[in-house]
Amino acid sequence: MSAEVSTTPAADNTVNGTPEATNPAATSAPEVTAVESASPSATPSANQPHSASLYVGELDPSVTEAMLYELFSSIGQVASIRVCRDAVTRRSLGYAYVNYNNTADGERALEDLNYTLIKGKPCRIMWSQRDPALRKTGQGNVFIKNLDAAIDNKALHDTFAAFGNILSCKVAQDEFGNSKGYGFVHYETAEAANNAIKHVNGMLLNDKKVFVGHHISKKDRQSKFEEMKANFTNVYIKNIDQEVTDEEFRKMFEKFGEITSATLSRDQEGKSRGFGFVNFSTHDSAQAAVDEMNDKEIKGQKLYVGRAQKKHEREEELRKQYEAARLEKASKYQGVNLYVKNLTDDVDDEKLRELFSPFGTITSAKVMRDTVTAGETSESEKEKESNKENEKEGEEKTEEKPKESEEEAKKTEKKILGKSKGFGFVCFSSPDEASKAVTEMNQRMVNGKPLYVALAQRKDVRRSQLEASIQARNTIRQQQAAAAAGMPQPYMQPAVFYGPGQQGFIPAGQRGGMPFAPQPGMVMGIPGGRPGQYPGPFPGQQGGRGMGPNQQIPPNFQGIPMGAMQGPGGIPNGMGYPQMAQVQFGRGAGGRGQVPGMPMGQGMRGPGYGQGRGGAPVQGGPRPQGGRGQPAAAPPAAGREEVPATGGLTAQTLNAVPPPQQKQMLGEALYPKIQAQQPELAGKITGMLLEMDNTELLGLLEDEEALRAKVDEALSVYDEYMKNKGEGEAPAEPAKPKEDAAETATEENKS
């Protein structure tokens, strides 16, 4: 996931030179690692004489620019504040930059506001250093470990402030805010760091002896760790018989060389836990012990002898093994495992195998089913109830028989297969067989339903593809909406908070806008606008019944791009596919006129040709050349594409057009067929069916029986919805006059 560039230090916070350390900070939060490398200067005057920029880290994700402005404006005049956010999700990264007009205010804020609680978390303030070379130098950076849990950032700062000027100070914390027992102090000079190491290393802090040393970069630690692995002396042994004593355990390995320590791990009761450690004085002795004793059988148990590993090492190895096994499994079934959907309830594993057996060797075939819940009544439970009734009637039974019948009933209940979920998987022995099955079986009618057959995908792959398709679809909609409105593409600029009296500016690269001075407390989101007012009239409404120039718009429209207010074809974005279907198809056939005030654009023609109310031609006749609430001429929108004819729709035809037009073409083809069956609810049912996959909709166009079944199913769902809605509402209104019946039906279709 991409993130905005941080100007804070970015070294890692792992324990200094110790293998047991784990990486406490992921790269998703650059401010977490800011302590380890920073500017070697105490003030920005050395490299940036006119800079008064502060880095503010350890922020709660909910902290906003306004909250920071309220805090930092108490020191002096704030030039600007920016909370850094992820470029995609726009979530806060946990750090921000505060710019003052003069350096003195920045120094005072650094002194007075450092470690101030913001939403329950102490913030960490330091000078912003924009030079990456200076940020990455570890000069003056000190690492402290074995800290007491009660020592926080401020306590650590107060302890080490006596040895020199501190640029930044931090105690590493977990996700719950608890101390990890180590921290970092970054001094202005290397002399101050050496002085702190000399005086504090080995001292007691809160009755705990601390280690203080120079910070070692991750690269250097990694090379040192690899060297330690190659020259190990500590050996781990497991599968040890519990009867083996400490003396016997030591004698097993004395023949390989001098032993500095040998111990068996025991529980609280003193019993052996079956493993132990032996530390040799030399690496050669340890290597010889591993080579000879590994897999050797002692007292009936085969020993495991290997290099002793730290916990994080073992976790990393297990993670790599799991990842390798997952990739191997995925590659094994890549291209041979098929996903089959739209199965009828009577299709089981055997029938599924029979359907696909002509295409090759099947290694497995399975139909996914629901699990039987405890509340469902099975045949075994019915038998138990009848047995209880017989007992009440006076039949004598022993106590063992009911228990046996209950146990048998439980076993039988576990074996009962649940209802089919309508999909399954078929695995072939080769990719060629699988591809042949996809070609032949996809969209084939089985028991009156068209099958959907495709290569099976993992859940994470499907999710990523779905997210990518949704993002692409939204981008296309925004571009079409902007083109239809005749507006330039929106410029995505991060929000910047300007203080009172600060001059705004147009970002570099943006053209066509007019600079303006933002109002105090204004968040700049879209250049060229101001709160509560749009710079000009809405597009497409010069004159007529549209809004006049500089017309005020409601405050809740502030900061919303005008291109986002309309979808393709001028349809508001608040309307989904069902509503679009009613607008597009509900005004053609059946003698209804077009929507008042909305010109009939390209791709908006209904499937029928007739006259609307009042004799106005709907399709097949000339367009109206003006009228109330309608422009005199409706030129085709810029960037709009003509929707191809819907006759003889195929998958290739659909793939040649954007996704929104695919649904439009399918809707235009489905509407006349559905109207022939349900004239009153054709628009609603069309919208409901458009939620299905395009491949299934193509199958419905070819199969009248399957379409009729889907229409009946949609009608039953709609009736159930109206029934439930009617039960929860107030009593129905009185019957409306006959002359309003047509208008009522129209409003229902629009809802």
From Swiss-Prot:
GO biological process: mRNA processing; mRNA transport; regulation of translation
SUPFAM superfamilies: PABC (PABP) domain, RNA-binding domain, RBD
Stretches assigned to the RRM domain: 52-130, 140-217, 233-310, 336-458
Keyword list, A-Z: Cytoplasm, mRNA processing, mRNA transport, Nucleus, Repeat, RNA-binding, Translation regulation, Transport
Stretch forming the signal peptide: none
Cellular compartments annotated: Cytoplasm; Nucleus
Molecular-function GO terms, alphabetical: RNA binding
Protein name per Swiss-Prot or TrEMBL: Polyadenylate-binding protein, cytoplasmic and nuclear
Species for this entry: Neosartorya fischeri (strain ATCC 1020 / DSM 3700 / CBS 544.65 / FGSC A1164 / JCM 1740 / NRRL 181 / WB 181) (Aspergillus fischerianus)
